[in-house]
Amino acid sequence: MTNLVRCNHSPTTDKTSDSMKRHCVLELQVFSREVKILRPTHIVLYTGNSYDIVKPWGLEGFTEIRTETVPVGKRVMPWLEATAVVDGEAVHMLRVGHPEGKGKAAFVEMVTQWVRRTVP
């Protein structure tokens, strides 16, 4: 998922204010309601750390497993692995920066490795 908040003040870049993030994610619970409907086993958030102010993104049982920065191609990206519980089921989460077309092959490989590591 690339959009935790479904509205924006700019057609090309994320200029979502912190108050809008809090309102949409924590108060309206748009993201957590979507997750309950979709019932995923894995979630990848391409938001970087700019949405960490609304962490745990309205999800229960949120537990951080690994938080660091990782080199991807020529970039260094934020990388957060976590689990949450949705309707009694574990959900694996990865919050990472968006590759923006740079080092895409390395980025895809890292995310793929994460998915493989976390599939039961």
Task: State where each predicted segment sits.
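Short, surface-exposed acidic-centric catalytic microdomains
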Residues: 1-15
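Proline-aspartate-enriched helix->loop->beta-strand connector
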Residues: 31-48
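Catalytic core of non-heme Fe(II) oxygenases with the double-stranded beta-helix
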Residues: 11-17, 39, 43
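Oxyanion-hole/transition-state-stabilizing segment in secreted/luminal serine hydrolases
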Residues: 9, 48-52
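Short His-Asn-centered micro-motif
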Residues: 2-3, 45-48, 96
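C-terminal capping/extension of enzyme domains
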Residues: 14-32, 51-120
